[in-house]
Regions:
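N-terminal leader regions that mediate targeting or early regulatory function
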Residues: 4-96, 113-116, 123-126, 131, ...
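Alpha-helical bundle/repeat cores within regulatory domains of eukaryotic proteins
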Residues: 96-154
Length: 154
C-alpha cells in the first residue's frame, strides 16, 4: 500500500486551525461549506482515511501501517479527527436528506465510524455512532436495515 505520511502532516496542520477541517482544506468559510461538501464527492475519504481502498472513489487515500501508527501517536492528528467527526455530525444535522431507506451519506457515516475506530479508538467511534442513532430517534426506522447493520459492525 502507498504511504500517506503527507496526510499526517495535513491532519496536523488542520488540527491547529480554528476553522472546520473541511472548510480549511478547501479554503472556504463555514457558510459555504455544506454546498461545497455536496459537490466534493471524495471529501469523506480525506476526512476519514482508512487502510483499504475506497469502493467508490479511485485514488482515495489508503493508509499504511506507518501512517496509522503516526496518526495514533499524534495528539494533533487525533484532535483533527475528532474535529472532523464533530463537523460531519453537524453537517448531517443540517442536511437531513440522508434520513431515508438509502442515501450515499449512509456509506459515509460507516466510513467515519470505521476511521475513528482505526485511528482514534473504540470510544470515539462508538460515541459518534451513538450520536447518529440518538439524532435519528424514532426516525431510525426510516433507515434501511443494511445501513444500520453496517454502522453497528463498523
Amino acid at each position: 500500500m502507498k504511504s500517506l505520511v503527507p496526510l499526517v502532516v495535513f491532519a496536523v496542520h488542520l488540527a491547529s486551525c480554528s476553522l472546520d477541517p473541511l472548510a480549511k482544506a478547501l479554503g472556504l468559510n463555514s457558510p459555504f461549506l455544506d454546498d461545497r461538501a455536496e459537490q466534493t464527492h471524495d471529501y469523506v475519504q480525506w476526512l476519514f482515511p482508512l487502510d483499504e481502498p475506497s469502493g467508490s472513489v479511485q485514488g482515495a487515500p489508503v493508509l499504511s501501517d506507518l501512517d496509522i501508527d503516526e496518526i495514533k501517536k499524534s495528539p494533533a492528528a487525533q484532535a483533527y479527527l475528532i474535529k472532523a467527526s464533530e463537523w460531519f455530525f453537524q453537517f448531517l444535522n443540517r442536511n437531513q436528506r440522508w434520513v431515508a431507506k438509502y442515501d450515499h451519506k449512509q456509506l459515509r457515516i460507516t466510513r467515519a465510524i470505521r476511521s475513528l475506530r482505526l485511528l482514534v479508538g473504540d470510544i470515539e467511534a462508538d460515541n459518534f455512532r451513538q450520536s447518529i442513532f440518538d439524532y435519528l430517534g424514532e426516525d431510525v426506522d426510516l433507515i434501511g436495515e443494511k445501513a444500520k447493520s453496517f454502522w453497528k459492525g463498523a
